């Protein structure tokens, strides 16, 4: 949340690892559906400077510059990223809706569509600066400090919107890693993320600008201490603790500083019971200031038979409501719908089961997975009478809804992935993902869910002396997306194909 993905410098990404299913035992409260690990690359040379520039249609531009230095015990890693794009429309008409007298549900009424200047993607720009220093005190102890500054602002048509949005973030952190021996180390880390969102008033010709108003501020603090211990050749044990504190301030909701803290203890044991059989068992104990005690276990059993790998896993998920869900109000300007907070929300909980089989042999790999995720106390929206919201002091609006634990949900799916290395620098791959979702309260699909998704990719790379060329083709085909937010009018299916080339010169 809060634009954190936008701050990642894609030029620094070494690889991306996706962990499907609940992973709260190691990754904490928010890991109820899955985890994406983004591993960045560190320079190994004394000096390494790189620039990555991309330009596309609709004014899409990105520039990423890295400057890394290593000298003796000292290391410095600096990066800057600029992203920007023009705005564009997918449709010059604004969708109109009518209400069914019997069901009271709204439905599309294309005959009433009106011309609009609204954009599917608004013009924007962002800047991100990262700096990290490391110092190796000796062969065992390494220290590090880091910081980030990020800003983002969009530019929307004044004929439609009264304001633009502006986001600003600064982060700072410090860490230490101590190698006990070659098989064990202790890692300590502290991190702070400070986010501010503002309204930037848009003035039409002849109008005076109202300036900028702070929408909300979020302060996040995370401290952790963990140890990793290899016990012989067949076992690795991890143990640690974590403390998280969050603060929310909002001028529009008259919040001077609502706080919530969470403490956690976690442990995980990875053990090879015999040559081809491995087990991973983990547990995370959580104490939250508002939601008290909870424990999330996870178990993974894997067996290797020649080129085949089999895996079965279970994981418990747990997610506490955010401070915004507990305290903040949100108003959709286009529909004049107010969303009011709920101080009595409960934490979401889930049970995730997965079976996986994988074949890996030389130039080909194929895997198929089946899973089921059962979610309890799912936080969703419950429609309420706008008059009630007005009586509670949230103003007069056309529509109103409140966050509430109204759903039990179940997500079942099958995913198949194929990758082939054809030789001579060529590789191709593809996947198919079927997902069946159900809100057990209404017997309807989960909002925003998609049932069928196909992906395909083809890559080729070749080096001529100092010059290296990479060509990548990526495609995605997706069925329509179910949506009750937009009055049960599903977003249409689509296909998207991206062709990218990368040209590298090693001087």
Regions found by a protein language model. Name each.
Residues 71-74, 136-140, 179-183, 230-234, ...:
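Outer-membrane beta-barrel channels and translocator barrels
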Residues 233, 272-278, 372-374, 395-484:
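Gram-negative outer-membrane beta-barrel transporters
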Residues 161-179, 216, 309, 316-376, ...:
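Outer-membrane beta-barrel signature, preferentially recognizing the C-terminal barrel domain
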Residues 68, 79, 123, 136, ...:
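Conserved C-terminal beta-signal and adjacent last beta-strands/turns
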Residues 1-20:
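Short acidic/polar hinge/loop motifs at secondary-structure boundaries
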Residues 25, 44-46, 54, 66-165:
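Periplasmic-side early beta-strands and strand-to-turn transitions of outer-membrane beta-barrels
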Residues 16-17, 36-38, 473:
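Non-catalytic regulatory/gating segments with a bias toward low-complexity or hydrophobic composition
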Residues 134-151, 167-291, 297-304, 364-371, ...:
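Face-selective signature of the C-terminal outer-membrane beta-barrel domain
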């Amino acid at each position: 949340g809060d634009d954190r993905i936008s701050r990642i410098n894609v030029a620094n990404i070494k690889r991306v690892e996706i962990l499907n299913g609940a992973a709260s035992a190691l990754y904490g409260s928010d890991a109820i559906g899955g985890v994406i690990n983004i591993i960045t690359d560190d320079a190994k040379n004394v000096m390494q400077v790189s620039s990555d520039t991309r330009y596309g249609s609709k004014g899409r531009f990105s520039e990423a510059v890295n400057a890394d230095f290593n000298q003796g015990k000292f290391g410095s890693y600096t990066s800057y990223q600029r992203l920007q794009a023009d705005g564009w429309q997918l449709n010059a008409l604004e969708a109109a809706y009518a209400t069914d007298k019997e069901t009271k549900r709204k439905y599309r009424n294309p005959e009433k569509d009106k011309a609009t200047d609204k954009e599917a993607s608004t013009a924007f720009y962002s800047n991100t600066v990262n700096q990290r220093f490391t110092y190796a005190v000796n062969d065992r102890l390494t220290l590090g400090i880091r910081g980030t500054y990020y800003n983002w602002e969009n530019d929307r048509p004044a004929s439609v919107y009264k304001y633009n949005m502006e986001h600003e973030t600064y982060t700072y952190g410090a860490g230490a890693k101590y190698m006990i021996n070659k098989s064990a180390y202790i890692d300590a880390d502290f991190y702070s993320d400070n986010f501010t969102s503002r309204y930037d008033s848009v003035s039409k010709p002849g109008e005076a600008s109202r300036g900028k108003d702070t929408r909300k501020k979020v302060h996040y603090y995370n401290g952790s201490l963990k140890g990793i211990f290899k016990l012989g050749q067949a076992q690795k044990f991890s143990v640690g603790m974590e403390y998280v504190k969050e603060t929310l301030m909002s001028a529009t909701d008259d919040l001077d500083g609502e706080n919530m803290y969470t403490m956690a203890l976690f442990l995980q044991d990875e053990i090879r019971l015999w040559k081809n059989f491995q087990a991973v068992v983990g547990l995370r104990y959580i104490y939250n200031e508002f939601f008290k005690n909870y424990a999330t276990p996870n178990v993974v059993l894997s067996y290797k038979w020649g080129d085949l790998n089999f895996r079965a896993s279970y994981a418990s998920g747990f997610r506490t409501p955010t401070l915004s869900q507990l305290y903040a109000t949100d108003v959709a300007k286009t529909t004049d719908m107010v969303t009011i907070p709920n101080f009595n929300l409960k934490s979401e909980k889930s049970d995730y089961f997965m079976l996986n089989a994988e074949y890996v042999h030389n130039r080909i790999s194929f895997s198929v997975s089946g899973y089921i995720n059962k979610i309890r106390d799912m936080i969703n929206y419950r429609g309420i009478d706008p008059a009630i919201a007005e009586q509670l002091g949230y103003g007069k609006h056309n529509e109103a809804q409140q966050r509430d634990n109204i759903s039990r949900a179940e997500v079942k799916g099958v995913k198949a992935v194929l990758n082939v290395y054809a030789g001579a620098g060529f590789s191709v791959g593809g996947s198919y993902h079927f997902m069946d979702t159900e809100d057990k309260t209404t017997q309807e699909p989960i909002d925003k869910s998609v049932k069928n998704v196909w992906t395909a990719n083809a890559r080729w790379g070749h080096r001529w002396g100092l010059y290296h060329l990479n060509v990548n083709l990526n495609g995605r085909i997706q069925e329509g997306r179910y949506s009750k937010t937009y009055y049960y009018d599903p977003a249409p299916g689509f296909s998207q194909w991206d062709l990218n080339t990368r040209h590298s010169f090693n001087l």
